[in-house]
Amino acid sequence: MTRSTRLYADDAEMYRLFETELFVAVVGDVMDTLGLRHQFLPPVFKPVDEKTRLLGRAMPVLEADIFPSDEATRNPLMTKPFGLMFEALDDLKPGEIYVASGASPRYALWGELMSTRAKILGARGALVDGFARDTDGIKALGFPCFCTGYYARDQGVRGKVIDYRCALEIGGVRIEPGTLLFGDKEGVLVIPRQAKQEVVRLALEKVRGEKLVAKAIREGMSAVDAYRTFGIM
């Protein structure tokens, strides 16, 4: 795509297009047509607040379970509370999404204070492959958080962050630092960097075409004729 035909100049313009015109279902549809048929995260991921959507670039965070004992450890990270969690949180950049995975579902990976810090740093949300807690506080902040459920149990003595800004896989979908994520209450998509421009272009064409289809159906056109005419349904 040449510079003159680009749909947006930067992330801010791209986010505006997503926020004003696009939704997950239509983006998923066009990704299917491009052969990107395995980019949805598992359907267990839901927003803490259904009014919020997830949109930004991934900052992956690797979690691991721990099982404390009285024996000496050979790993200095084991003596550090929460491992590298605070460093990972403080390293968030504007426009990024904190994406945590690797832990078993025994404790919460995200909460209100983490949301507060992330919001101050300009992050656009959190996606944790596990539980969130302090959900009323997260809702009050208006901070987008997607998780697999709610559980108040703390990770302090049960898990640690062992790395960040590293590639992850969630549900068989690879997420690298900087990968674009788009989510709403109907699902979360991982949009590969090399396909992003084409995905946005086709999604805009489809969503604008769907408005024409809806108008035709309201005016009496049958579903068969609508699909034959527009190729959209």
Where in the sequence are the language-model features?
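Acidic, glycine-rich flexible loop/linker segments
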Residues: Y150-A226
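Structural motif
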Residues: G28, H38-Q39, R57-P60, E96-V99, ...
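Short, ordered loop/turn segments at secondary-structure junctions
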Residues: I66, A103, G130-R133, Y150-Y151, ...
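Intrinsically disordered, low-complexity regions enriched in acidic/Ser/Thr/Pro/Gln residues
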Residues: M1-A88, G209, K215-M221
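A general structural motif
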Residues: M78-G83, Y107, I162, C166-A167
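Ligand/cofactor pocket segment of small-molecule handling proteins
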Residues: I120, R124-A152
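Extracellular/luminal Protease-associated
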Residues: E87-S115, K119-D129
